[in-house]
């Protein structure tokens, strides 16, 4: 994400480039955080695990992600709904699931970009993660972005 010193996603911290950012942790991107906190862009702060499962839900073709994570906290729409400023639209809603339990509904919406790193690629855009310490969620990130026609940008060594 960043290094607290202006690298990573902070290189894109410009209100003419970014209009909405959603994260589970903003600490490594102080410039992007400032844009959100100052109301220059829309900003959401959702629990990190929810963000991961939400992206997996997009990749899986779901319409939303339901969870009890965040109930009664700043994520709850009855509190702040995870919004970092007044400009940010409320996305999270409360619903009752089929078992009668109240859940937070994190709606699915198109993602425009996925940024990732890989070891190498070929002329067809196939990538390999042979030198990365952790594959993590890169595949689901790419699938989620491509679901709605977004772009995947990959930095490779070769």
For every predicted segment, state its role.
Residues 1-158:
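Conserved alpha/beta enzyme-core scaffold
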């Amino acid at each position: 994400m960043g290094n607290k010193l202006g690298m990573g996603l902070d290189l894109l911290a410009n209100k003419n480039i970014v209009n909405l950012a959603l994260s589970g942790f903003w600490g490594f991107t102080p410039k992007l955080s400032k844009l959100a906190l100052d109301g220059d862009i829309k900003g959401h702060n959702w629990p990190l695990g929810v963000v991961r499962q939400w992206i997996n839900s997009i990749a899986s073709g779901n319409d939303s992600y339901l969870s009890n994570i965040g109930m009664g906290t700043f994520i709850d729409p009855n509190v702040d709904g995870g919004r970092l400023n007044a400009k940010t639209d409320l996305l999270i809603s409360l619903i009752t699931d089929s078992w009668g339990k109240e859940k937070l509904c994190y709606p699915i919406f198109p993602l425009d970009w996925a940024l990732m790193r890989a070891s190498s690629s070929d002329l067809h855009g196939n990538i390999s993660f042979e030198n990365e310490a952790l594959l993590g969620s890169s595949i689901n990130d790419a699938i989620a972005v491509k679901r709605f026609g977004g772009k995947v940008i990959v930095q490779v060594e070769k």
